[in-house]
């Protein structure tokens, strides 16, 4: 699921780079912990609220592109937040506990936000959780 969001961001940024006129805003949403079962549950719940059997589609399930991916880190079957965030932001897997470096822990990798900023875009990052 994490690569899905990276794919969507990559496609959006690519389209923005080659489209005329240039996109004014690009949003990259990350549904942490959200998989197919969570989406299906939400759609089933929304349909039930309307007294229907079946699903009521969420808007993002209607996007023209989607992908299914593996979400393990470079060294573990279960990804932690550091490795997951690095993969989402940079497109590179790393070791659990590592942030913005490859699994060798020496080679830095840069986020799509940094690339956008270098390209002249204004960048903002928001979260719904505290940074501990």
Predicted regions, residues:
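Sec-dependent N-terminal signal peptides
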Residues: 4-13
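N-terminal catalytic scaffold of extracellular/periplasmic and nuclease hydrolases
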Residues: 20-132
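Sec/Tat signal peptide C-region and signal peptidase I cleavage site
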Residues: 15-19
């Amino acid at each position: 699921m994490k690569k899905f969001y990276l794919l969507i961001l990559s496609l959006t940024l690519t389209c923005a780079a080659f489209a005329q006129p240039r996109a004014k805003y690009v949003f990259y949403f990350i549904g942490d912990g959200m998989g197919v079962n969570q989406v299906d549950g939400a759609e089933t719940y929304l349909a039930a609220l309307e007294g229907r059997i079946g699903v009521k589609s969420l808007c993002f399930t209607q996007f023209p592109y989607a992908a299914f991916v593996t979400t393990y880190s470079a060294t573990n079957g279960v990804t932690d937040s550091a490795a997951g965030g690095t993969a989402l932001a940079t497109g590179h897997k790393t070791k659990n506990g590592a942030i913005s470096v490859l699994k060798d822990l020496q080679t830095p990798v840069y986020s799509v936000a940094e690339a956008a900023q270098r390209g002249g875009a204004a960048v903002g990052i928001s979260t719904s959780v505290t940074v501990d």
